[in-house]
Curated annotation (Swiss-Prot):
Gene Ontology CC: cytoplasmic exosome (RNase complex)
Protein name: Exosome complex component Rrp42
Biological processes, Gene Ontology terms: rRNA catabolic process
InterPro entries per UniProt: ExoRNase_PH_dom1, ExoRNase_PH_dom2, ExoRNase_PH_dom2_sf, Exosome_comp_Rrp42_subfam, PNPase/RNase_PH_dom_sf, Ribosomal_Su5_D2-typ_SF, Rrp42_archaea
Species this chain originates from: Saccharolobus solfataricus (strain ATCC 35092 / DSM 1617 / JCM 11322 / P2)
Predominant subcellular localization, coarse grouping: cytoplasm
Length: 275
């Protein structure tokens, strides 16, 4: 079983005291203010063999997301919708405690949060992925790989997922007497996305709340709360992690900070996506 850095007590007490003493002055180890996000870069179409892909670098955290489309049957309870399947892998090269093998509970949790944010926001219109109602639909496989764990991997996974979906090509479907097939030589458009979604994480360290915690900050945090937003700032996902607790006042303050951060991050994401 792999364990995430936030579960490892790897920061000496002296270093924690040093980090918190900087918080008292309103700054962090890397020079950021408590409410600042790390530098973000997004490279679209990074994996050429995928139908869509994006490489996201958030500080030292690096995540690659790729998509593949295939014709499939709809689920029985959603005959008029396409399918979305999200997988996240914490690669062993990303951090020293990550182990090879099937996804562990940390990877599964990340996949569920990303999936829930995309579904509950209706960012991806699954009804437009229907080829033949009740018979055939597009299944979107969204695979997310954490390549370098430098903290706050959830926000990076959401960014990479959304960017990869926006980058995804949809190919022509051809009807035959014996069924249907995909013509990979003819692109007919992109996935039917309504708008982007972002996730903003805020960590509680001692009495301080910090946006986009890095690896050291996650290692000493008491708890973390993550909010997912649509462009109209509707909350479409909330996830709390860490062993410590957060008061209602902490949560309210964290949400206010996350909301204002989401406005800026959504604008930056839109510029990268050209929308």
């Amino acid at each position: 079983m792999s364990s995430t850095p936030s579960n490892q007590n790897i920061i000496p007490i002296i270093k924690k005291e040093s980090i918190v003493s900087l918080f008292e002055k309103g700054i962090r180890q890397d020079g950021r203010k408590l409410t600042d996000y790390r530098p973000l870069s997004i490279t679209l179409d990074y994996a050429k063999k995928a139908d869509g892909s994006a490489l996201v670098k958030l500080g030292t955290t690096m995540v690659l997301a790729g998509t593949k489309l295939e014709i499939d049957k709809p689920y029985e309870d959603t005959p008029n919708q396409g399918n979305l399947i999200v997988n996240v892998e914490l690669l062993p090269l990303a951090y020293e405690t990550f182990e090879p093998g099937p996804p562990d509970e940390n990877a599964i949790e990340l996949a569920r949060v990303v999936d829930r944010s995309l579904r509950d926001s209706k960012a991806l219109d699954l009804t437009k992925l229907v080829i033949e109602p009740g018979k055939s639909v597009w299944t979107v496989w969204l695979d997310v790989y954490v390549l370098d764990y430098g903290g706050n991997v959830l926000d990076a996974c959401t960014l990479a997922s959304v960017a990869a979906l926006y980058n995804t090509k949809v190919y022509k479907v051809e009807q035959h007497s014996n069924g249907i097939s995909v013509n990979k030589n003819e692109v007919v458009g992109k996935l039917p996305l309504n708008y982007p979604v972002v996730t903003i994480s805020v960590a509680k360290v001692d009495k301080y709340l910090v946006v986009d915690p890095d690896l050291d900050e996650e290692s000493i945090m008491d708890a973390k709360i993550s909010f997912s937003y649509t462009p109209d700032l509707k909350i479409v996902g909330i996830q709390k992690s860490g062993k410590g607790s957060m008061s209602l006042q902490d949560i309210d303050q964290a949400e206010n900070t996350a909301r204002s951060t989401a406005v800026k991050l959504l604008e930056e994401l839109k510029k990268h996506l050209g929308i």
